[in-house]
Amino acid sequence: MVIEQQITGAIIAGIKELYGADVTASQVQLQKTKKEFKGHLTLVVFPFLRMSKKSPEQTAQEIGEYLLRNEPAVAEFNVIKGFLNLTVACSCWIDLLNSINEQPAYGIIPVTEQSPLVMIEYSSPNTNKPLHLGHVRNNLLGYSLSKIMKANGNQIVKTNIVNDRGIHICKSMLAWQKWGNGATPESTGKKGDHLIGDFYVLFSNKLKEETHALEAKGLTKEEAEAQSTLMAEAREMLRKWEAGDKEVRALWEMMNNWVYAGFNETYKMMGVDFDKIYYESQTYLEGKGKVMEGLEKGIFYRREDGSVWADLTKDGLDEKLLLRADGTSVYMTQDIGTAKLRFDDYPINKMIYVVGNEQNYHFQVLSILLDKLGFEFGKGLVHFSYGMVELPEGKMKSREGTVVDADDLMAEMISTAREISQELGKLNEMTPEEAENIARIVGLGSLKYFILKVDPRKNMTFNPKESIDFNGNTGPFIQYTYARIRSVLRKAAEQGIALPEQLPLTFAISEKEENLIQMIADYAEIVKEAGKLYSPACVANYIYDLVKEYNQFYHDFSILREENPELKNFRLVLSANVAKIVKSGMDLLGIEVPERM
């Protein structure tokens, strides 16, 4: 904050004048004053005692008196046990608000051609099922992180790796071939990803029937699966796919295209997008090539059964399979190839993988393998590891068909938002189109905010009912407050009030108003902190605190009915800047805010 920098400079000058000592800004510990004490900023004086050779209280008193004489930003001070509490002059707060008011994109660092390039991978779906609740948290975190990193002055490439090949894909293909009767998205009226997901579940159920019958004959579960003709057919289909069989490839392409059309609808509704999409089918051969190079160089080794492994025991890990005995690849193989292609395609300064914490070990291994293969970027990979998300009912499983689909969840959220908004009268005097748009904005905002306000590293339970409350730490509470401020500003415009670009520094404001300005000013630091910690939750909870503080101000003070024109203008400018920061912060979370509600 500018005021802190100004006072820090004065403290440095004061230490020099009072004690003849040179100190740097990093030695000046200036922090927000605790609520139970009077003041805005508190200086910790203990680091200066060896310079002053006096008690903490006396040192604080002398520095306070110096600031009062020499720094106009300091209006008064008090000393509590060696802590110097400073009250900032009223004119400084108004001046700070003027400065923020001049900046439409306050807190956002502009991106230039020289800015570092950050690539962020998120989503990573399989083409054998629709996106589910787990993908929702992944997509929302990845998209929000991309906006936060851009706001910190980075060029951004949002990327997705689609797992479009492998045995799990062949299971859906085989089920469609055997029992699909030529079903298409058009003939069934289903989204393509949902249709293919149905066949994945069907395969799982048919496999259970077959293995249970074999187990009834006395076979163990493992023996039954090994003798399963269905699994044998699926493996044969995968072998044919890898061999480039035309019929298998044509079926694969047709079914994957159905899925992509479905995914695109889901991404559009969710409000997330990508700059570059990679497909495992296009990267796994690159990975296999790199593994074979590593084998030739003695970095990896081959076992008797023909499989290729990496021995990472000297790195404190175990042995890692890279190619199966039949020559087929594993996820690690593909990730090696994808990483290589990405760094060939872009001058990446930082590569961030948004992937759940169950893959912590995987990315630890990937980083070491890339380093062993001689890729400098290996050590710099960032795994943005996040916790699992569940519904109150418990975990999700896709093989049994009991998974919570992203499409169904979003539709349910919008429907609930519509009902609650109607009950509360928030859709009155709106056209059906406007009302539907508000239901969409509030429903999706509820979902996004509830997920993003949680520390990404923690497991969480998504509670739809709690998320859509218009009170408390929720998206609708923030959205409604924004709409309320916009309503006040519209009424001011209707009364012919033009907001001044600069407020005079000659009138007094309350402590609550000073605190609100301080909170607005904090936004720039919050954006930096969110980028440093890779945490949208920093932004979400800051915006909630700001909105909560504004609502208290709105309750306690008149705005349009204020008789003093200077104070009225000040409160309107203050409100406008709260709205500006709320909109900016919610945008970093990928959440829309309505102009009216």
Regions found by a protein language model. Name each.
Residues 1-94, 112-597:
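Non-catalytic interaction-recognition regions
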Residues 95-100:
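Short, charged, solvent-exposed linker or helix-capping segments at domain edges/interfaces
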Residues 101-113:
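Flexible, low-complexity linker/hinge segments
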